[in-house]
UniProtKB/Swiss-Prot annotation:
Record-linked HAMAP family: Ribosomal_bL35 (MF_00514)
Cellular compartments per GO CC: cytosolic large ribosomal subunit
Organism, scientific name: Koribacter versatilis (strain Ellin345)
UniProt entry tagged with the keyword Ribonucleoprotein: yes
GO molecular function ontology, one term from the record: structural constituent of ribosome
GO process annotations (BP): translation
Similarity remark: Belongs to the bacterial ribosomal protein bL35 family.
Gene for this chain: rpmI
UniProt entry keywords in alphabetical sequence: Ribonucleoprotein, Ribosomal protein
Superkingdom of this protein's organism: Bacteria
UniProt entry tagged with the keyword Cytoplasm: no
Name of the protein described by the UniProt record: Large ribosomal subunit protein bL35
Region annotation Disordered: where it falls in the sequence: 1-25
Length: 64
């Protein structure tokens, strides 16, 4: 069986944790930040986890 190719777009956006979960960065922190509160911008800096429904698909895209 041939080796699986890594989806390069997914590799840039997601990282696997040691426990097998998938981390992602949060959206809405790129531009138009003047109308957003400091607290909201601070929470966008925190990393989130991919939902359980999407995790198997992402794991297939980043096998290594």
């Amino acid at each position: 069986m041939p080796k699986l190719k890594t989806h390069s777009g997914a590799a840039k956006r997601f990282k696997k944790t040691a426990t097998g979960k998938v981390k992602r960065s949060k959206a809405f922190k790129r531009h138009i930040l003047t109308s957003k509160s400091t607290k909201k911008k601070r929470h966008f800096d925190m990393e989130g986890l991919v939902s359980k429904a999407d995790t198997p698909k992402i794991k297939r895209m980043i096998p290594y």
